[in-house]
Every structure is written in structure tokens, then in C-alpha cells.
Amino acid sequence: MDNLVELPDEFVLPRYGGHCLADVMPAVARSLGLDDREWSGRSAPADPMAALPQARHWVVMLVDGMGRNLVEEHASLAPFLTRMNSIPDMTCAVPSTTATSLTCLGTGMEPGHHGTLGYTFRSPEGPIMNALSWANGPDPLTMQASPTAFERLAEHGVETFSIGPTGFVTSGLTQSGLRGPRYLSVRDEDDIDLRAELVADTLRGTTASVSYVYERSLDHVGHGSGCRSAQWRRRLTWTDELVEAIGEVLTPDSALVVTADHGMVDVPDDHMIIAEDQAGLLADVDELGGEPRTRHVYTDHPDEVAERWRSILADRAMVLTADQALHMGLLGKWDPAMRNRLGDVLAFMRGQWAVMTRQMPREMSLIGMHGSLTDDEMLIPLLYCEG
């Protein structure tokens, strides 16, 4: 099959190698005077993130679901975020989903290297796993054995902290892609002052430090109510207040960078395609993975299945074989050992369309979704300020 594919106008390719989420922690390491090239794979002397300030203490905050387009569209609701300095042209990785993105941030590696290839996908041990709940997941070190960015920073004497929900400290995703830092649990995630106090505590030491802060509520509201709902808009304003509170505790030798793991689109009920109800869509398909906006399709007949999905979905999706996706560089640097995890066919949904499956009934209640290549899902902010 021809590997040349015409990209739909609304699709954005990941900007690996300088303007992607995987490049954030290497940039922070460079700002601390460390040489990141051995572990990030960066070889070019130019630094796309050279605008980041020099600082002894860094706070790296990731707001789940806070796509760049959404922030710009609602700028009046996020005055502090809007005033922050910005590095443009940033994208998340592919697929545009939390598990993949958090592992990119935590390791400084691209998906094809770290191997967390979506929300659900075939685990190294065979069955479809859920990378958030870790259902059917292997030992986290089997999943991702390379040192994380936090572990590499610690090797150079940098203190590292992670500030997040209590239940995440022992999760498979944390232990796979974000392991290493001292974990500071947030028991009341609505308490802005508590979060700011925890950040302030990490800035008091004399040793250089990097503190990772994870905030998830905006994504949760977007999934349940829609990413342009009144509830979402209120939560964006709350998120802006949280970021401002963290900014206010910065010390003169510290800096804050704020980014996101993906954006979001709302999917109307009449744009939800139920796989089991589409004649022929599941023919020769062994398993479905991924999520509604990007499906991993596992099959022994990839060319035939890809053609069938293209015929049925038509202009509602870009359907690729795994070889085509890898040829396009969608997963970045590719480790062939990850091949069994990747779908043999990949369906990237266009517009506001989604492919649902009754095997994953919780999907049916979602309004806001992500995972595909539209600019609303792929473009993320990279904002920063100094103390």
C-alpha cells in the first residue's frame, strides 16, 4: 500500500523535536545547566525553547484538557493565563490523550520510544490494557523501563517533587512514566490555597528543584458537560485562579511553566458511530483499542480492513495502516519492540465524529472527547512566568 497520505486541512502533525510536550522537561533541564542530549535524543544546537528563563527552581504544571484553542477562545475568562509569556506552535503527541501525553512529559520521550500508545491498546503481555486505570496492565517497568526525566534530574542532584491527587501516587501510569519524584498528595483538589502552599514548600530549599503539578478537573468537566459548556467555562476561571495562586508564591529564583496534555472537541449524539451497528466495520477485526476519536484496530488483514473502514467512514475519518502512520512520523522516534502494542489500522476521526463501541460502555456518556489530530485537540499552550 502507498504510504503517501493527504492530510486533512484541520489536522495538525505533532511537532516533535522542539515544539512538542515531550520537549518540555529537556528544556527545563537545559535551563538548569544540564546536557539533555543523551536522554532526549536532541542533537540540533538550536533550542526552540531558548526563551524560557534561567531558574534554580522550576514548577511544571500540566492542566488536563486545556487546549490552546479553547484558552484563546475564552481569554476573558482566564486573564492570568492570557498575561503569561507564551512559546507558540506547541503540540501534544499522538494520540492526543492523557496517558500518552503524561508519559511524554514525564520521560522526555516520544510515544514510539516510551510505548504508551493511547488510552487503551495491547499491552506488552497481550490483552488490551487501560493505561489510566492500568486494568490488564503489566508491571510498570515492563511497560516503560527507561529512566524518567525526574530520575535523570535526580542523578544530577536536582530535587524533584510531584503534586497531585492522593490516589495517583501508586498508579501504574505514575510508576511507568512519572516515577521518581517525592509525591505530595493533594487531598482536597478544590483547595487552591493548599495547592499553592505545597508548591511554596518545594521552593524553599537551597538545592535546585523541579516540581510537577497535575490538575485534572477541567478535563473531567469537559468530558461530562462539554468543553464549551457553562460548567467548563466556570472551571476554566477557577483554573486560572489556581495558576495565579501558584504564580504568587514563586520566589525570585524560580519560574512556572504551564502546559496541557491535549485539547478537546464536543461530539454530538448524532455524530457517534456505533461500530457494532455498522455493517462490515468489524469484519476481520480481532480487537478495538484506543478511544472514540482515535481507534487502534487489531487485525491480521490490515490492508483489507483499512480499505473497508475508509469506504464506510468516508470523509469522517483518516484511516491509516500502521506502516502509513509510522512513515508519517506520527509516533516520533520508533522502537520496533513496540509494534505489537500499535493497532494494525488506525482511524483518526475528523470534525466532531467518533467511533464508539459497546465493549466500552462508559464512552457513551461522554460529550467532550479527544485523541485525534484536529487543531482543537493537538495544539497546546506553553506559558511561563518568573518569580
Model-based region annotation:
Residues M1-G387:
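Feature captures the catalytic ectodomains and active-site-proximal regions of enzymes
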